[in-house]
Amino acid sequence: MQVGKILLPLLILGNAFMALSANDGRDAKFIPASDSRIAYMGRISTAKPDTVRFTYPGVNINAGFTGTSLKMGVKPGSGSYMIEIDDELPYRLNIGPNDSIVTLAESLPEGNHKVRATYVLEGYALKPEFHGFYVDKGADLSAKPVLPKRKIEFIGNSITCGYGVEADKPTDRFTYD
């Protein structure tokens, strides 16, 4: 009888742990940030192997992919992105202190899809990194997206990138939250 009182909670905890860890990218195919089918726009650094680093808002990561879901490997606690899947309305994705693999899309119909992840914070203190994408087993990235030939570069400071645009009042101080 005592064994049952101990085993049941252990089984419940074990199942809970397995459910939590099931979404960590282990059942997916990893494609590193250095893959030539990923297109970047903005100032990036590729000095660290298989990693793309950046600090400026507006840097975006573009790719086409097949399958029904997509995850992204990032540096934990590195800020926020606006995510666009298949030209649908973008949504904001905040990278928490424990997030290293984040879900961008799931339950998509089978077929070809595209993603754009745009960094939306000043990343100087956060030092964001992109490590790569996770696609479904049997899925892959498509050909590298064609970026616009003409671009406009904005050179400025915090005001240029929208410092305080999400503040409730003019006296609010900047935070990464």
Predicted regions: what is each one?
Residues 1-27:
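Bacterial Sec-dependent N-terminal signal peptides
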Residues 20-155, 160-176:
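N-terminal secretory targeting modules
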